């Protein structure tokens, strides 16, 4: 019998884990070269398992795994996991924000669809979440939301009105909506940006260093951008509401 094909030393993050048996876990991981992958971590729940202290969310890992013998199977077998190190686990709002991004990736990324640039952006966001992030948190979150939507083909061009392809006027306010894309905002719509700011965002997304450029472009417009992206993302994620979003609402109500 031919040996199972193996993926070795793959940069990855754990997005989510759940019980598979009394001693094992199913992992949903985001890999740089393989995309979103499901793995069974046999024995990972045992106190003696080398996997147990390593398979945590928001921690950079090197993973090795054997592909399922059935080439069409979705779940592969974890063979090795090594913590890369470099930062501590985020806490507080930063931890919730990281889990929110993980949930977006779980809902929106198809299995085995690689997005290396998006993985690199995610790595940068996690680094910020684990640091004394201060005012940097909101811009990196908004930037990643834009990059994610663009990577999976759900973000229209921000340089023109979506339905008419008419160019944006610098001082006219426009809003981003789920079914109509970018359109002129009504007077009562508060979540909108002037045309020149949408164009700045588009230029940033087109930049070779799109993550850093988009973070800078998002910084002055986070308050206006946040509700528009939240609505767009929830629309594409479908029902029910994102669990992390509901948790944030519940905590704010306390």
From Swiss-Prot:
Instruction: For this entry, list what GO says about its biological process.
Output: DNA recombination; double-strand break repair
Q: Looking at the Swiss-Prot or TrEMBL record, what is one Pfam family this protein matches? A: RecO_C
**What are its GO cellular component terms?**
bacterial nucleoid
Keyword terms of this UniProt record? DNA damage, DNA recombination, DNA repair
InterPro entries to which the protein is assigned, alphabetical: ARFGAP/RecO, DNA_rep/recomb_RecO_N, NA-bd_OB-fold, RecO, RecO_C
From which domain of life does this come? Answer: Bacteria
Give start-end ranges for the coiled-coil region(s): none
Quote the Gene3D superfamilies the UniProt record gives.
Nucleic acid-binding proteins, Recombination protein O, C-terminal domain
> What PANTHER family does UniProt report for this protein, alphabetically?
DNA REPAIR PROTEIN RECO (PTHR33991:SF1)
UniProt family annotation: Belongs to the RecO family.
Role description: Involved in DNA repair and RecF pathway recombination.
The entry's protein name is DNA repair protein RecO
């Amino acid at each position: 019998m031919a040996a199972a094909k193996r993926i070795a030393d793959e940069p990855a993050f754990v997005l989510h884990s759940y019980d598979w048996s009394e001693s094992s876990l199913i992992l949903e991981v985001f890999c740089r070269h393989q995309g979103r992958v499901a793995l069974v971590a046999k024995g990972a729940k045992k106190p003696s398992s080398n996997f147990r202290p390593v398979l945590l969310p928001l921690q950079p890992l090197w993973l090795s795994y054997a592909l399922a013998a059935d080439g069409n199977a979705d779940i592969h077998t974890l063979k090795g996991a090594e913590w890369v190190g470099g930062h501590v686990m985020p806490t507080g709002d930063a931890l919730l924000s990281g889990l929110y991004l993980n949930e977006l990736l779980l809902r929106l990324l198809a299995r085995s669809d690689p997005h290396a640039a998006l993985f690199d952006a995610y790595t940068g966001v996690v680094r910020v979440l684990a640091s004394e992030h201060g005012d940097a948190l909101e811009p990196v979150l908004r930037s990643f939301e834009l990059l994610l939507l663009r990577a999976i083909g759900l973000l229209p061009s921000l340089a023109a009105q979506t339905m008419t392809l008419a160019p944006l006027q610098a001082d006219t306010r426009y809003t981003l909506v789920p079914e109509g894309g970018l359109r002129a905002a009504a007077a009562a719509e508060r979540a909108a940006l002037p045309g020149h700011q949408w164009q700045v965002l588009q230029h940033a997304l087109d930049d070779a260093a799109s993550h850093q450029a988009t973070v800078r472009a998002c910084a002055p417009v986070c308050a206006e951008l946040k509700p528009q992206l939240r609505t767009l993302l929830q629309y594409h994620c479908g029902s029910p509401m994102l669990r992390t979003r509901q948790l944030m609402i519940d905590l704010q109500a306390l």
